[in-house]
C-alpha cells in the first residue's frame, strides 16, 4: 500500500510540475482550454436539432453591424480625419466575426443578445470591423457560431459544428448580395472562425463568378489558411502588392521571439506582410508601420460559468501608436516585435507561447484602414 501511495504521489508531482511548466512558459491559456474542454465542454455527439432556429437575415436584430444603425463598429481612432460615410460609401464590407462563444453546454450559440457572447461580438465590431468604416458600409451578420470547444475535438466533430455555423454565414452573405449590395463592389473581411467560413464563401460562391470581379479584396485574417486552396481557384488569387484587386490577404501573428520554434503545418499557410502588403514579405522595419490601436472594451475569455452579459463598456478608440513594430513572414507565419511590456502585451500573450492571435487586427489597425481605402480607390479608378 505504501508503495502504491508513493507512486501516486510521484505521478501527482510530475503532473503538477508539468502544469507549472506550462504556466511559466506562457501556455497557461492552452492548458486552461484543454482542462475546460476535457471537464466542461458540451456533450457528444453533436446534434444540430438541438440548436436554436436559424436566424432570418431580413430581421435587423440578426446583424451585429448595419450601416443604417449606429454602433461600436463606427468608432474611429482619435485624431483620424475619416468622416462618417456609413450608408453613403460606394463600397460595402461583409465582415464575418470570429469565435466569441467560449462557455456554455451547447455546441452552437443561442443567439441570445443579453449574453457575454454578444458582448464579445460587439468587441469584434469595435476592434476588428471598425478599420473598414473608412472605406465601406459595414455589414456583419450574427450567426450560430461554433463553440470554442469544437476546435479541440476530433476532425469529424469539428467539421460538423463549423459546417453547421457556416450555413448561417452563407445565407447571410446571399441575403447581403440580394438585398443590400445593389451591385456595389465589396470587401470580404474576417478573423479566425470567421476566416474559416469566409474561405468557403470564396471557394463556393465568389470564385469563378461575377462576384469575384466585384470583390475588391478579401482580408481573411487569423488562424489557418493554406496556400493550396487557391491552386484550384479560377478568378481569386493571392494579393502581392498594396493595390492588387480580386485577391486574398491573410496573416497569423506571432512574437518574433519564437521565430525559430518549429510549428508543424504552419509552413503551408498564406502569409501577407501588412507593412509591405507583399506575399511572403520579408523583414520590414518599423518606419512603414501606420499604427496600432489599443482595443476598446474587454474580450471575455472565461471558459465556464454563466453566459450572462456582464455590462462591458466600450470607450472611444485612442490615438494610433505609429512605428511600433517590425514584421516579417517566415515559413507561413507573421512574426512581429515582441509585445511584452507594451499596451498590447497582456492581450497578445493570452494564448501563450508567443501566439498573438488576439492582436491580428489591433496592432495593424491603421495599416488595414489605409490599405482598404487604397484598394477601394484603385478599384474605383479602374472602373472609371
Task: Enumerate the language-model features and the residues they cover.
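Active-site signature of alpha/beta-hydrolase-fold catalytic machinery across serine-
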Residues: 19, 200-204
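Structural recognition of the beta-strand scaffold that forms the well-ordered cores
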Residues: 92-95, 139-142, 187, 217-220, ...
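N-terminal low-complexity, Ser/Thr- and acidic-residue-enriched intrinsically disordered segments
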Residues: 2-118
Amino acid at each position: 500500500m505504501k508503495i502504491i501511495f508513493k507512486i501516486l504521489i510521484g505521478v501527482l508531482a510530475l503532473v503538477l510540475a508539468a502544469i507549472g511548466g506550462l504556466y511559466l512558459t506562457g501556455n497557461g491559456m492552452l492548458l486552461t482550454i484543454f482542462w475546460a474542454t476535457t471537464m466542461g465542454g458540451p456533450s457528444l455527439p453533436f446534434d444540430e436539432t438541438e440548436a436554436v432556429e436559424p436566424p432570418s437575415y431580413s430581421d435587423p436584430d440578426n446583424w451585429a453591424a448595419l450601416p443604417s444603425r449606429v454602433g461600436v463598429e463606427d468608432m474611429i481612432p482619435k485624431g483620424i480625419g475619416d468622416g462618417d460615410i456609413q450608408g453613403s460609401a460606394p463600397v460595402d464590407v461583409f465582415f464575418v466575426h470570429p469565435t466569441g462563444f467560449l462557455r456554455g453546454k451547447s455546441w452552437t450559440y443561442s443567439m441570445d443578445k443579453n449574453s457575454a457572447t454578444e458582448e464579445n461580438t460587439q468587441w469584434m465590431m469595435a476592434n476588428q470591423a471598425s478599420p473598414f468604416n473608412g472605406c465601406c458600409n459595414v455589414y456583419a451578420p450574427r450567426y450560430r457560431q461554433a463553440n470554442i470547444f469544437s476546435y479541440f475535438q476530433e476532425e469529424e466533430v469539428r467539421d460538423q459544428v463549423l459546417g453547421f455555423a457556416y450555413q448561417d454565414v452563407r445565407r447571410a452573405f446571399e441575403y447581403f448580395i440580394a438585398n443590400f449590395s445593389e451591385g456595389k463592389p465589396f470587401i470580404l473581411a474576417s478573423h479566425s472562425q470567421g476566416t474559416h467560413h469566409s474561405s468557403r464563401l470564396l471557394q463556393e460562391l465568389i470564385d469563378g463568378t461575377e462576384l469575384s470581379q466585384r470583390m475588391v479584396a478579401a482580408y481573411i485574417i487569423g488562424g489557418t489558411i493554406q496556400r493550396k486552396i487557391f491552386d484550384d481557384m479560377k478568378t481569386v488569387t493571392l494579393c502581392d502588392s498594396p493595390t492588387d484587386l480580386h485577391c486574398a490577404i491573410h496573416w497569423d501573428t506571432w512574437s518574433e521571439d519564437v521565430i525559430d520554434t518549429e510549428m508543424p503545418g504552419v509552413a503551408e499557410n498564406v502569409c501577407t506582410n501588412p507593412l509591405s502588403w507583399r506575399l511572403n514579405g520579408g523583414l520590414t522595419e518599423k518606419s512603414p508601420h501606420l499604427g496600432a490601436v489599443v482595443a476598446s472594451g474587454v474580450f471575455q475569455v472565461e471558459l465556464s460559468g454563466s453566459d450572462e452579459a456582464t455590462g462591458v463598456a466600450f470607450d472611444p478608440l485612442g490615438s494610433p501608436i505609429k512605428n511600433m513594430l517590425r514584421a516579417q513572414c517566415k515559413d507561413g507565419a507573421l512574426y512581429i516585435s515582441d509585445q511584452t511590456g507594451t499596451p498590447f502585451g497582456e492581450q497578445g500573450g493570452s494564448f501563450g507561447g508567443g501566439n498573438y492571435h488576439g492582436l491580428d487586427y489591433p496592432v495593424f489597425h491603421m495599416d488595414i484602414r489605409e490599405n482598404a481605402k487604397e484598394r477601394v480607390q484603385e478599384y474605383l479608378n479602374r472602373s472609371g
